[in-house]
Design a protein with these regions (language model features):
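Glycine-rich anion/phosphate-binding loop at the beta-strand->alpha-helix junction
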Residues: 102-135
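N-terminal glycine-/serine-/threonine-rich phosphate-binding loop
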Residues: 1-53, 118-119
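A short, flexible low-complexity segment enriched in Lys/Arg and Gly/Pro that occurs
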Residues: 1-9, 97-109
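Short beta-strand segments
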Residues: 25-29, 62-64, 117, 124-126
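Glycine-rich, flexible loop/turn motifs
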Residues: 9, 13, 31, 76, ...
Length: 135
């Protein structure tokens, strides 16, 4: 499935990518599944500000209404934070279903990397990489 027609890149992110300026992709699962509201939203916005303060453009990535989003507004981050675990934790295998159902998804590391690559973003920061568990 070619997902590029479903990709929305925020104007600020698109301009930075086109100009060769630094852009940092951020996953969104940490917002919906990693912390309780409102700390999740406060932390996400603070991380974006730290990136800005250091001369780069943040691009938090998620799937909203079936659209792959590279760069969220503060309102979209708030939406994900309030919905919390009601939002699908979206891995690679979930993309086609979420897009076809016009559903929401908070992106895991894998999905964030895929969408970031589609948007021309080469740098990615995360709060942690899962998949390794004791017991």
């Amino acid at each position: 499935m070619n997902l590029n027609p479903y990709l929305d890149v925020a104007p600020e992110v698109a301009a930075a990518v086109a100009a060769g300026k630094p852009v940092v992709a951020l996953e969104s699962t940490i917002i919906s599944h990693g912390m309780p509201y409102p700390q999740n939203v406060e932390t996400a916005l603070k991380v974006e500000q730290i990136i800005r303060d250091n001369g780069a453009v943040p691009a938090t990535i998620a799937i909203l209404g079936g659209r792959l989003k590279a760069g969220l507004t503060a309102e979209e981050i708030e939406y994900l934070g309030k919905k919390g675990q009601d939002v699908t934790k979206a891995s690679r295998r979930d993309l086609a279903v979420l897009v076809s159902r016009k559903a929401d998804g908070a992106t895991t590391v894998t999905t964030t990397m895929m969408i970031a690559h589609m948007a021309g973003i080469q740098v990615f920061a995360t709060g942690g990489i899962g998949g390794v568990h004791r017991g």
